[in-house]
From Swiss-Prot:
Name this protein carries in UniProt: Malonyl-[acyl-carrier protein] O-methyltransferase
GO MF term (any one): malonyl-CoA methyltransferase activity
InterPro entries in the cross-refs: BioC, Methyltransf_11, SAM-dependent_MTases_sf
EC number: 2.1.1.197
Family: Belongs to the methyltransferase superfamily.
Cell inner membrane as UniProt keyword: no
The species this protein was found in: Bacteroides thetaiotaomicron (strain ATCC 29148 / DSM 2079 / JCM 5827 / CCUG 10774 / NCTC 10582 / VPI-5482 / E50)
Presence of keyword Secreted: no
GO biological process annotation, one example: methylation
Principal EC category: transferase
Metabolic or biological pathway, per its Swiss-Prot or TrEMBL entry: Cofactor biosynthesis; biotin biosynthesis
Catalytic activity entry: malonyl-[ACP] + S-adenosyl-L-methionine = malonyl-[ACP] methyl ester + S-adenosyl-L-homocysteine
Role, per record: Converts the free carboxyl group of a malonyl-thioester to its methyl ester by transfer of a methyl group from S-adenosyl-L-methionine (SAM). It allows to synthesize pimeloyl-ACP via the fatty acid synthetic pathway.
Length: 261
């Protein structure tokens, strides 16, 4: 993963992400309901990695009432999106790559919503989270599965190396007891393929791979008008449902507890 490119894309989408990220907001709401069901509250020490503009963060603060809430994101600029949260004395922000930066230990909960798919090695990160958690700590996250944005992958051959729910569970179970897991498909409808591309750009996902964009060649090379027309024609032909075209999200939700030694 080219983390620099990832950070640049999401930084550019800061002003439009909250408006366009309806699926991510829906997923965050569901994550909160699952946390309320499976994790004791209040939850004293919470780390959220990949906090973005703070959609999930605000829900965490309101619902879990942590004594300490550490927000982390790859993009330093996300701090400014969370200024209202950072006015609360128990909330702090740490920018950097969650796979490599230092986090405080003895946390009660490490959690994330719609971020893990950008990691180089979720499996190594699971091991790391186990060492950072309190002996009775929890690890809860949502990510995306192999059918996420399947329409884009089918047309361009590009996409992230998504893990299946079974692969995630197998890696997690080495360090955690899995309390709950679920996956679902969320289809979105758009007027035409151009609206799909606009949606992806406005949410920071204008390239589905960290190394390459949707475009067929180099990261900085844009499509020609003919390329764009061909993409839209194929998208319309293959993914029209009624009077609109579809884009599929494939969220996976997992709640786990640190294994007893």
């Amino acid at each position: 993963m080219n983390k620099t490119i990832i950070a640049e894309r999401f930084s550019k989408a800061i002003s439009t992400y909250p408006r366009e990220a309806n699926v991510q907001r829906q997923i965050a709401n569901k994550m909160i309901r699952l946390l309320q069901k499976h994790i004791p509250s209040p939850c004293p020490k919470v780390i959220e990695f990949g906090c973005g503009t703070g959609i999930y963060s605000r829900m965490l603060l309101r619902t879990l009432r942590p004594e300490e809430l550490l927000l982390n994101d790859l993009c330093p600029e996300m701090r400014y999106c969370c200024e209202d949260l950072l006015r609360e004395k128990q909330v702090s922000f740490l920018s950097g790559d969650a796979e490599t930066i230092s986090f405080p230990d003895k946390s009660t909960l490490i959690t994330s919503c719609s971020a893990l798919q950008w990691f180089d090695s979720p499996e190594e990160f699971f091991k790391r989270c186990n060492t950072l958690l309190h002996s009775q700590g929890y690890f809860a996250f949502s990510t995306f599965g192999k059918k996420n944005m399947k329409e884009i992958r089918e047309l361009t051959g590009k996409g992230l190396p998504y893990r299946s729910r079974e692969e995630l569970e197998a890696a997690l179970s080495l360090h955690f007891d899995i309390l709950y897991s679920e996956e679902e498909l969320i289809p979105l409808s758009f007027e035409d393929p151009m609206k799909v591309l606009y949606h992806l750009k406005q949410t920071g996902v204008n390239g589905l791979s960290a190394q390459s964009s949707l475009y067929p060649k180099h990261e900085k090379q844009t499509w020609t008008r003919r390329d764009l027309q061909h993409f839209c024609e194929r998208y319309t032909q293959e993914f029209t449902q009624g009077t609109s075209v579809s884009l599929t999200y494939h969220p996976i939700y997992i709640i786990a507890k640190k294994k007893k030694v």
